[in-house]
Amino acid sequence: MIKLLLRQLIKFKVIFIIAVLFFAIPSSFGDKGTFVDEIKFIQYLDENTALQEVRNGNLDLYYFRVSSDRLEDYNSRENLQVFESTGSYYSILTNPTDSGKFNPFSIKEIRFALNYLVDRNLIVNELLGGFGSPMISNYGVFSADYLGILDVTESFQFRYNTSLADQMISDELEKAGAKKINGIWNFDNEPIEITIFIRSDDPVRKSIGEILSFQLESIGFIVKKDFGDLNKAYVVVYGSDPAEQKWNLYTEAWSSTGFSRYDSIALAQMYAPWFSNMPGNNTPSYWNYQNEILDNVTQNIYSGNFETADERTLLIKDATKEGVNESVRIFLASKVDQYVVNENITGIINALGAGVPSRFTPINASSNDGSLVIGVKQIYQGAWNPIAGLGDIYSNQIWGILSDPGMYGHPFTGKIIPLRTTWNIETNGSHSSIPVHDDAIIWNTKTQSWNTVESDLTAISKITFDLNFSQWHNGQNMDINDILYSIYFLTEWGSEKDVNDKTYDSHFSPQAVQNVNSLVGFRIIDDDTIEVYTNYWHFDDGQIASWAGTWSTTPWEIMSAMEKSVIDGKVSFSRSDAVSKNINWLSLIVPRDAKIIHDILEDFKQSEYVPSSLNQFETSNAYYENRYNQSINWIEEYDHAVISNGPFYLERYSPESRTIVTKSFDYGDYPFPPGKWHEYEQIKFPKITSVEIDEVISKNSSVKIPILTKNSSEIHYFLSNSRGQIISEGKVSVNENNSIINLDSETVSKFDTGANTLKVFAASNDVLRPYEYSTSFLASETDTSLPNVEITTTLSESGQTDYSFLVIVIALIIGAGIIFIIKTRSKRTQKTTI
């Protein structure tokens, strides 16, 4: 379920708060940040139909992968631009509950046995057409931390082996008291039935589900197949109590919406109960999967409780080992996605991770008629709210152009870059002691007021943010009150849960509390400058800024109305809370929920309501009335409550026609001109143009291997024997496109007599995507030639390639960093469900 990694985590990135109300845009015009005036998103479930529509020009581009067999030759690509990108992958989620009827997957060893029952190579080679790589853990071949955990993942030695899986499962079932009668496993004289929820809207996952069903039936289970899309999965799988056993297995997929060097979320999101993404989702009334080891280790990674990159890597190894051993979520394969764009469209930005659907593409793209028509796989699959909604890839791809985060991950390096905030950081390492200003304040959840911090406080890091405000889509100016409310909300809803606590959400709060625990205080310097003091440190300054980032993508009055609607029990922020309480999952794009927000705003206006988080700073009744009026007017005109600050605004959502229309925001002083992201269009990727190595080398000699490259800063090389063991590896610099690998005679003598392999990667400091060259050579004990043997050479930038070494290179390039999805907030990012 591609949980994109897009739902912005709350790493004290107040940025996560999404706006949902819009007021009628004033008739005056201002600065425009886009080339096109309108974008229409239209649902196309069938990829083949969408492909033909893009080819014919009825669609300008399609925001979902197209099967490789539809783009095999020149004729199939007529009138098309084809872009390849990595970032999506597949997994199996198991239900490990031990409550209710007998559940075989409550037994860890049976879950683990599934790793031998799934044929990862078949998934890659047949279902994905070779465009992918097998996965053992949540770190795929393009994750920078892959190298650091390579010894852990390789130690599992998973190979497709149905006999072994059958034996492992049978042994555990017999221990539990089950018996096999006439080829069917029974428990307490009842056949053991397994329900697999299969995503029927995705051909790959449908095939995975069908194959797995057949294999489990062959072992002796009764298998019930339940088909559906993400909307149904939100209810049956993610929203239900695992103890009800409405499902036992689910075919998931995940996608990225951005790119980041360092990932603090992935392991927690995919393995740890505290993050509210494992069976039970931390819903108090549900059965919940528990694992203190995973919770403790991933919380240390998440909150920066390490001093060095090596220490961080050890934590990642520990969590990975425990996560794979537990096998509640089993990873299968990563995918190389192919996106199609009509040949007449310019300005496409094929970002690493997010691919063509990155937020930069619609903002930067141009067409002949000043509009874009974009096909999407699904137009609506989950609630639109910034707290515990927007967790699917489909909503996030659109939300990304409606909102501007304070900072963002560079689409090709992953480096945190300023967008609407700039910063200055003061810290002296993980044991730093920065004095906290006496005027700094912190929210007191008991007195419901801002209090000055205690005297003589210190913090590990101090970050001063300069905020680049503009207008909300409803015409009102952004201001410091929006920031104040965001900090209040994070603190109030991220406080430890009390009895009958109404400001607690089972999904949002456990994540928020990690940030709140590190927040020491903050100080307003002026109307657009704020100081933040935090007990958080990272060896990368951008990560410190991301953790402490103060920004808002939703007006405070919308946030306040949402908060009241949840406290009053009308709706819920999260899916699981909504299901458990039998209320609606708050979605600002839906007229029904927008009406709830509208009516609360009317009550606020009539009662002259002033939030307790703002009454110490803003006393003008006219200010509050104007804020309420603007958002009320917006909802009345547009029938939704999605209000933000990005270059496009949401004009309408039409569920009947399965369309969403956005228009360029031309009012006010939007800070970025059209073409701001032009530099990302034609990124120069590294390339190897030649490698000179003899087909036969003597093991008694030294060897020089000249290499010619383009757009490269360094060369990484790996030499391995016929058994795949790495004999030598290293890195050499590039000087004027030239580089030489020097191997001394001692190194050469270690080669196997016979076939060996050289893999070379050209890397660039500007793009974290190396170019791969691979060739075989023969090693001889003497200087005499060996019999003729076919020598294979491969040059590859992407596509049907063995990416195992590519991952290693990326990891070396960025050290202990992580390539990960950066949700449209510049903050920590999560995978989003597909």
Segments (PLM) and residue ranges:
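Ligand-site clamp/hinge motif
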Residues: 31-72, 222, 673-698, 704-706
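Long beta-strand-rich cores associated with HINT superfamily self-processing modules
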Residues: 266, 341-382, 394, 649-650, ...
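Periplasmic binding protein-like
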Residues: 51-66, 75, 218-276, 475
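Surface-exposed binding/hinge segments that line
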Residues: 503-623, 647, 652, 657-659, ...
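Local pocket/hinge segments that shape ligand/substrate recognition
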Residues: 32-33, 43, 65-170, 186-188, ...
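Extracytoplasmic/peripheral linker and loop segments enriched in polar/acidic and small residues
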Residues: 112, 124-127, 224-233, 263-342, ...
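Aromatic- and charge-enriched surface segment that lines or borders ligand/interaction sites
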Residues: 50-58, 101-113, 117, 434-499
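Append "and occasionally in soluble cytosolic enzymes with long acidic Gly/Pro-rich linkers
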Residues: 106-218, 318, 360, 364, ...
